[in-house]
C-alpha cells in the first residue's frame, strides 16, 4: 500500500517537474559585433582554441581561460562546468556546448552558450576575463507553487541564498561555487546551488548572484524552484536535491529555529530527468520567463 502510494506520488511529482522546469531554448547566442571569413586566421584560431577547451577545462578542475593568436587574430575563450561535475562529465558537456556554438555561430567573432546542467562557453576577439556581464540572461521557474507559509518560506530562503552566495563569492580564483540546504518546517527542504566564473572578483561574483536572486524573486516569487543564468554566474534553487554535495563547497547555515525535525521524506524526483530536459534545451516559454538581449 505504502509502496504504491509512494510510486504514484513520485511519478506525478516527476511529470510535474518535467513540465514545469520546461524552460528556455535560448542558447547559444551569437553576438552581432563582427564576423570572420571562412579560412581566416581568426577562424582557424577560434577552432583550435575551442577544440582545446573540453580537455583543458576538465583537466583543470572545471574552469579554464585561454587565448591564442596575435593582434586582431587573437581569440579569448572561457569554459566552465558545474562545480560538482566529474572530469568526464565536464569534458562531454563542454564538448557538446562547443559543437552547438560552432553550428549556431559559424562565423561570429564572439559567441556565448550554456547547457542546462550546466557548462558555459564564451569566446571573443577581445578580453572579457574578470568582466562582469549580466546579459544575456535567462530566468525560468518551476511552475509548482510553494505550499507552505510564504512568510516563513521567505525567511528560510533568504538566509539560505545569503549563505551560498557568500560562500561562493569567497571562493578561489579557480572555483567560486557553493551549495546549501535548509529545513523548511519539519518535512521539507530547500536546496540551492550558485556558481560564478572564478575570474570574477569576490565583489563582482556577489553582485552577479544577488542580481540573479532578486531577478528570481521579482519574476517568480512563490514558485517552487528556479534558475537564473548569466554569462558569469548561475543561480538555481529547488525543493529537491539536484547536485552532488561536497563538504568543502557546502555553505553552513545558522541552525533553524525548531531543531527537532525528523529527516526529510526520501522521495525526491531523480534530478537527471529535469537536468537532461534543461540540457537538451527543451524549454517551453513561460509567462514569467525573462530573456534579455545581447549587446
Ligand atoms: C554576421 O553574419 C550574420 C550571418 O551569419 C549576419 O546576420 C550578421 O549581420 C553579420 N554581422 C555583421 C556585423 O556583419
Ligand atoms: C577553405 O579551405 C578549404 C581547404 O583548404 C578549401 O577547400 C575551401 O575552398 C576554402 N574556402 C574558402 C571560402 O576559401
Ligand atoms: C590547453 O590545451 C593545449 C592543447 O590541447 C595545450 O597546449 C595547453 O598547454 C593547454 N593549456 C592549459 C592552460 O592547460
Ligand atoms: C563532441 O560532441 C560532438 C557533437 O555533440 C560528438 O559528435 C563528438 O563525438 C563529441 N566528441 C567527444 C570526444 O566526445
Ligand atoms: C500556482 O498558483 C497560481 C496562482 O496562485 C495558480 O494559478 C496556479 O495554477 C498554481 N499552480 C499550481 C501548479 O498549482
Ligand atoms: C505565516 O507565518 C507568519 C509568521 O510565522 C504568521 O504571522 C502568519 O500569520 C502566517 N500566515 C498564515 C496564512 O498562516
Ligand atoms: C573567506 O574564506 C576564507 C578561507 O578561504 C575564510 O578564512 C574567511 O573567513 C572567509 N570569509 C567569509 C566572509 O566567509
Ligand atoms: C570534494 O572537494 C574537494 C576539494 O575541491 C575534492 O578534492 C574532492 O575530490 C571532492 N570530493 C568529491 C567526493 O567529489
Regions found by a protein language model. Name each.
Residues 2-295:
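Extracellular secretory-pathway ectodomains and N-terminal mature segments of eukaryotic proteins
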Amino acid at each position: 500500500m505504502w509502496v504504491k502510494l509512494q510510486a504514484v506520488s513520485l511519478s506525478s511529482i516527476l511529470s510535474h517537474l518535467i513540465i514545469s522546469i520546461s524552460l528556455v531554448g535560448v542558447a547559444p547566442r551569437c553576438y552581432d559585433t563582427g564576423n570572420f571569413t571562412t579560412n581566416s586566421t581568426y577562424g582557424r584560431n577560434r577552432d583550435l582554441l575551442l577544440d582545446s577547451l573540453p580537455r583543458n577545462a576538465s583537466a583543470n578542475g572545471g574552469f579554464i581561460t585561454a587565448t591564442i593568436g596575435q593582434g586582431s587574430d587573437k581569440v579569448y575563450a572561457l569554459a566552465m562546468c558545474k562545480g560538482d561535475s566529474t572530469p568526464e562529465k565536464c569534458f562531454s558537456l563542454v564538448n557538446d556546448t562547443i559543437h552547438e556554438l560552432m553550428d549556431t555561430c559559424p562565423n561570429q567573432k564572439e559567441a556565448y552558450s550554456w547547457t542546462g546542467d550546466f557548462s558555459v562557453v564564451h569566446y571573443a576577439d577581445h578580453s572579457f576575463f574578470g568582466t562582469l556581464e549580466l546579459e544575456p540572461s535567462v530566468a525560468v521557474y518551476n511552475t509548482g507553487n510553494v505550499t507552505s507559509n510564504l512568510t516563513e518560506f521567505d525567511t528560510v530562503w533568504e538566509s539560505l541564498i545569503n549563505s551560498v552566495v557568500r560562500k561562493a563569492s569567497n571562493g578561489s580564483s579557480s572555483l567560486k561555487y557553493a551549495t546549501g540546504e535548509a529545513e523548511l518546517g519539519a518535512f521539507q527542504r530547500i536546496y540551492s546551488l550558485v556558481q560564478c566564473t572564478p575570474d570574477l572578483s569576490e565583489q563582482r561574483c556577489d553582485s552577479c548572484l544577488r542580481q540573479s536572486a532578486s531577478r528570481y524573486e521579482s519574476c517568480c516569487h512563490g514558485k517552487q524552484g528556479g534558475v537564473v543564468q548569466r554569462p558569469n554566474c548561475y543561480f538555481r534553487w529547488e525543493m529537491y536535491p539536484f547536485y552532488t554535495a561536497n563538504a568543502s563547497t557546502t555553505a553552513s547555515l545558522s541552525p533553524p529555529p525548531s531543531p527537532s525535525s525528523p529527516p526529510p521524506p526520501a522521495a525526491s524526483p531523480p534530478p537527471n530527468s529535469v537536468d537532461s530536459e534543461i540540457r537538451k534545451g527543451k524549454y517551453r516559454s513561460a509567462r514569467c520567463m525573462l530573456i534579455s538581449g545581447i549587446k
